[in-house]
Amino acid sequence: MGTATFSEAVLKNLIQHDYNIVQVVSQPDRRVGRKKELKMPEVKVVALEHDIPVFQPQRIKDDYQAIIDMQPDLIITAAYGQMIPQEVLDCPRLGCINVHASLLPKYRGGAPVHYAILNGDEKTGVTIMYMVKKMDAGNIIYQKETPISNDETVGELYDRLSILGAEAIIEAMPAIIEGTNESIPQDESKVTYSPVISREQEKIDFNKPAVEVYNHVRGLNPWPGAYTTYQGKTVKIYQGLVHNCP
């Protein structure tokens, strides 16, 4: 289950390692761009290339029977974008697992890659975890770390974490299937959140220290893009440089 590039990488790796994918669930096709052309989610494109059935409910909480009817042994989600109903979580005999782009319990939520750079973190990673009703709160199965360079953008880090997540799920799968994996509860005292970036957050505050402004710019590059205003017009800024003034 997934929609974005992150889930595309996971699906491709599962296919390459000969796992039997009985169904792919993604968000509906969306109209994008000035011409409002209908675009399929990346994960759907991969599924169709490999003759895998695709299910695209508008709202999964109201339309999930097709998933249960497949009687899956295991459900894997990666950047799906909707909360999964309990009926689906209870369906597979091996459980539902999620590939999350942070080192949980840090950065639960929908924008973990953005916040890692916005906050100037020196490392991040991916987490394979069991899914529960509460968002990103399940037991941790497997984690994989990676450093963050001080000039990396959110787009660049997202691409790297997509690959890392695809590697991590393959490394974790044998123990999950055999039932020999050991999962550990998350430390609730260390939980932080990464809510979706709001329009207000996109605006640059030049009263902040230069390093924070720099992190803000690269933490929103290429999407949604940091901005300021100049002569009454909105100006997007995608690059910055910190100078050490004498």
Predicted regions and their residues:
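One-carbon transfer enzymes
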Residues: 1-224
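C-terminal active-site/capping subdomain that shapes the small-molecule cofactor and substrate pocket
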Residues: 208, 214-246
